[in-house]
Amino acid sequence: MPPPTATVAPAAGGSFPELTCPADFAAVAAPGGRFSVVGFGSLLSERSARSTFPELEGFRVAALRGFRRVFAHAAPIFFERGIAIEATKEFSSLSVEPCDSELIVVTVFEIKEEEVPAFIEREHEFRFLAVVPEGLDGVPFTNRAVVCARYSDEEYFQGRCQGSKEIYYQRYGRYNIDKIWRDDILPCRLYLRHCVLAAKNLGEPAYSFFLDHTYLGDRKTTIREYLTTTGAGIMEEEPPESLKSRYGG
C-alpha cells in the first residue's frame, strides 16, 4: 500500500466543526454510541491509549488531512512528573492545528459515551474539532472523529476557565505557566522520545511522517532535523523507573 500524500484535496483550514460541550459530541457518535478519538502524540502508543481508555476498541493507524503537528503547548503534566526542564524551556507537548497543505499519520480508536466527560476534562485546554480521518489508502472513514487541536490563551481563559484567575492558577499558574500556547518552547525530552518510539512501533509510514511532518514551534524545523542537531541524544535517554511504562513508546 503506497504511503499517503499531502498533495491531494487538502482540507480548508478552520473548516472543522468545533465541539464545545458534551452534547455536541453526540453529532459525531458512531452507531452503538461510541466516539472516535484521534491520537497524534502519546496516543500513537496503544499501551498509552489503553492506560487512558482501558475499554477502547478498534485501535488503528489512519491519516488526517489538513492538519500540522507542532510542539507549541506548555504541558503541566511534565512539571507534575518532574520531567520538565524549565531552564532550557523543554516542557512542550504536542498539539495539532489546521494547515491546508499538511497531512499527518495518526491513530484512531473508539471510546464509550460515558468516557466523554472525563476526556473533555483531561484535555481541558484544547479545542475539540470534528474531523474525517482516512485510511492510508486515502479512503475517508465513514464516521467523524474528535481531535484535540490548538486553542488560544484568551479563549481558554475566558471560556474554559470562565475568566477565573483561580481556576487558571490551579491548572497552570502554580507551575509558573503564564502562557499555554507558545512558539518559543522545546519538546519535553522524555515525551518526544516516547512519541518517536510509538510512531516507530506503528511502522511505516507513521514513523517517517512523524519525523518529517512534526515541527518545533517555528513551524520549519522538523523532528528529524531536531534530533540530529539541538536534540541529539534524546533517543538514548532512559526514563526513570517509575515512568518507564508510561514513556516507553
Can you say where each PLM-predicted feature lies in the sequence?
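A glycine-rich, hydrophobic/aromatic-adjacent loop/helix-cap motif
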Residues: 2-249
